[in-house]
Swiss-Prot record:
This is Polymerase acidic protein. Its cofactor is Mn(2+). Keywords: Cap snatching, Endonuclease, Eukaryotic host gene expression shutoff by virus, Eukaryotic host transcription shutoff by virus, Host cytoplasm, Host gene expression shutoff by virus, Host nucleus, Host-virus interaction, Hydrolase, Inhibition of host RNA polymerase II by virus, Manganese, Metal-binding, Nuclease, Phosphoprotein. It comes from Influenza A virus (strain A/Hong Kong/212/2003 H5N1 genotype Z+). The keyword Metal-binding applies.
Length: 712
């Protein structure tokens, strides 16, 4: 296609497509259409001038000193902002009605905008589509076809015969050029209806009044404001920009020095509690190696098989009650699970899924019939004191040490591999050697990482829960929490962490909540850090024999039970937790790239194989922590995984706002003499997010360590 047009037109067409996020290499027909259209617009305007007597004349090679003005203003081929600026200024100076869509040309002789069309179909069809689309009496339409036909509004063709013949000849040449390269047939057939021109959205009525009322000071109308915004140059001196914006703003730029920043204030209050959807470092697995039982791979079969590996069950009792809940119900729920699993065993054929009986304890735990009754708005809009519930402010919590321990554990290696080599996904294109080498090195560093176990566990639980929520909306389905891995010797292993019982799940919207009760095995005694387990009721359900250096010891086995909830959108993201692998791989790649550009050769091999080199991992009160490249990979992965496990509005806000302060501090560290205004406001915005979320509080304390060291 490129060879059929001149380089300037090709460049403009590529720019136009990029602006709409389209790729000329892929959408070649569209690319050809845009090139053709641009060329016709330029030819339309070529050689046409207006002389000093305001007469329209044609000059092909004339006196360069003659006072001539171009007859046509070319709008097509400019970027959107610029194009609208031109249209606005034409309308302001000539009083012509402003078009809804960006036209192609403006004719200073006839004082009208022109819409040019080039079609591979019937000119009439295309003309009608254009007319229907722009719905404006004022804009003149002129359509050309590749077969030499044309059609224009009121049969007024604007230009002389010869100029139009030149355009038709060129179109015919383009057609031949494309045909000789085997492009024409596909191009001819690919034309779709009219859809690409951008609409100028007119605001009327109430919305218009609201818009006019909410303009910044010093703007008399929405139009003025639009024109100002279109012409706003984003770079330049800040003080100048601010004074340009408004007389009321007088931002004094304060220098940001080593002594300027203060640490973030972390909230006081009781220690924060665990809020993840499943247990992390405290989880305990019942496992089977080399599973080959009948129905292997069916979750319920696998779960029963795992349960049978344990012989230390005992009469359960509550060791740490839930402060607000009806604790006997949690106990009864676990007993019910055991009893119903036993019932399954006694049946001839084990079913593939198990729906729990709707007992009073499960109805209570799953919040059945607890939702306030929905009333049609029509029936209550006359109620005089209709208002939303007052919701309590969230209670402040202080940072507790358990969340740092959780993070450290997530960075550690386990003795099993949780992903296969291809888990990060093959590229569609034949991938260059370097990228696959990096991916393999990275996978080797993280495949045994505990954070990777959390990913696979999260993917499994969310997938199973979303499936059950759609397939068994009314049932209290029992969902085993399962993961699969390989041992050091490469043997397959299936693990059971516990069970989930799902509540009613008629999920219409993305944010509609499905309640569930989770019951998870653990060897952690909840009485050691009771604040961490505030939301749980913990039972003691058995004794487990553990092999230690001293011999076998018996340890009590606990069951952590809580009610919880999630939504379609959260489950969707949970199912996609493997993205964390990709995100951390990309962060590592950018480190390798930086290293490689300094050394001017690819450093992938050295990067991963030079075991002596240490890398900065993070800041702690002790200073900058360093570690091997593997440790860096696992730390980055753990951060990404925790961002997913502990996702929350507090985290979103903290990440966005603290990043600004981080950039300022880094600028100071690089001796760039940064300046700020309203630093107090920035601190407020950051600290507003420090309420009670364990992961956000931990990140804030890391941030304080960073500030302290960065500005020493």
């Amino acid at each position: 296609v490129r060879q059929c047009f001149n380089p300037m037109i090709v460049e403009l067409a590529e720019k136009a497509m990029k602006e709409y996020g389209e790729d000329p290499k892929i959408e070649t027909n569209k690319f050809a259409a845009i090139c053709t259209h641009l060329e016709v617009c330029f030819m339309y305007s070529d050689f046409h001038f207006i002389d000093e007597r305001s007469e329209s004349i044609i000059v092909e090679s004339g006196d360069p000193n003659a006072l001539l003005k171009h007859r046509f203003e070319i709008i097509e081929g400019r970027d959107r902002t610029m194009a609208w600026t031109v249209v606005n200024s034409i309308c302001n100076t000539t009083g012509v009605e402003k078009p809804k869509f960006l036209p192609d040309l403006y004719d200073y002789k006839e004082n009208r905008f022109i819409e040019i069309g080039v079609t591979r179909r019937e000119v009439h069809t295309y003309y009608l589509e254009k007319a229907n689309k722009i719905k404006s009496e004022k804009t003149h339409i002129h359509i050309f076809s590749f077969t030499g036909e044309e059609m224009a509004t009121k049969a007024d063709y604007t230009l002389d015969e010869e100029s139009r013949a030149r355009i038709k000849t060129r179109l015919f040449t383009i057609r031949q050029e494309m045909a000789s390269r085997g492009l024409w047939d596909s191009f001819r057939q690919s034309e779709r209806g009219e859809e690409t021109i951008e609409e100028k959205f007119e605001i009327t009525g109430t919305m218009r009044r609201l818009a006019d009322q909410s303009l910044p000071p010093n703007f008399s109308s929405l139009e003025n404001f639009r024109t100002y915004v279109d012409g706003f140059e984003p770079n330049g001196c800040i003080e100048g920009k601010l004074s340009q914006m408004s007389k009321e703003v007088n931002a004094r730029i304060e220098p940001f020095l080593k002594t300027t920043p203060r640490p973030l204030r972390l909230p006081d209050g009781p220690p924060c509690s665990q809020r993840s959807k499943f247990l992390l470092m405290d989880a305990l697995k019942l496992s089977i190696e080399d599973p080959s039982h009948e129905g292997e791979g069916i979750p319920l079969y696998d779960a029963i098989k795992c349960m049978k590996t344990f012989f230390g069950w005992k009469e359960p009792n509550i060791v740490k009650p839930h402060e607000k809940g009806i604790n006997p119900n949690y106990l009864l729920a676990w007993k019910q699970v055991l009893a119903e699993l036993q019932d399954i065993e006694n049946e001839e054929k084990i079913p593939k899924t198990k729906n729990m009986k709707k007992t009073s304890q499960l109805k209570w735990a799953l919040g059945e019939n607890m939702a306030p009754e929905k009333v049609d708005f029509e029936d209550c809009k006359d109620v005089s004191d209709l208002r939303q519930y007052d919701s309590d402010e969230p209670e402040s919590r202080s940072l507790a040490s358990w969340i740092q321990s959780e993070f450290n554990k997530a960075c550690e290696l386990t003795d099993s591999s949780w992903i296969e080599l291809d888990e990060i996904g093959e590229d569609v294109a034949p991938i260059e050697h370097i990228a696959s080498m990096r991916r393999n090195y990275f996978t080797a560093e993280v495949s045994h990482c505990r954070a990777t176990e959390y990913i696979m566990k999260g993917v499994y639980i969310n997938t199973a829960l979303l499936n059950a929520s759609c397939a068994a909306m009314d049932d209290f389905q029992l969902i085993p929490m399962i993961s699969k891995c390989r041992t050091k010797e490469g043997r397959r292993k299936t693990n059971l962490y516990g069970f989930i019982i799902k509540g009613r799940s008629h999920l219409r919207n993305d944010t509609d909540v499905v309640n569930f009760v989770s019951m998870e095995f653990s060897l952690t005694d909840p009485r050691l850090e009771p604040h961490k387990w505030e939301k749980y009721c913990v039972l003691e359900i058995g004794d487990m024999l553990l092999r230690t250096a001293v011999g076998q010891v018996s340890r009590p086995m606990f069951l952590y039970v809580r009610t919880n909830g999630t939504s379609k959108i959260k489950m969707k993201w949970g199912m996609e937790m493997r993205r964390c692998l990709l995100q951390s791989l990309q962060q590592i790649e950018s480190m390798i790239e930086a290293e490689s550009s300094v050394k001017e050769k690819d450093m992938t091999k050295e990067f991963f194989e030079n075991k002596s080199e240490t890398w900065p991992i993070g800041e702690s009160p002790k200073g900058v922590e360093e570690g091997s490249i593997g440790k860096v990979c696992r730390t980055l992965l753990a951060k990404s995984v925790f961002n997913s496990l502990y996702a929350s509005p507090q985290l979103e806000g903290f990440s966005a706002e603290s990043r600004k302060l981080l950039l300022i501090a880094q600028a100071l560290r690089d001796n760039l003499e940064p300046g700020t205004f309203d630093l107090g406001g920035l601190y407020e915005a950051i600290e507003e997010c420090l309420i009670n979320d364990p992961w956000v509080l931990l990140n804030a304390s890391w941030f304080n360590s960073f500030l302290a060291h960065a500005l020493k």
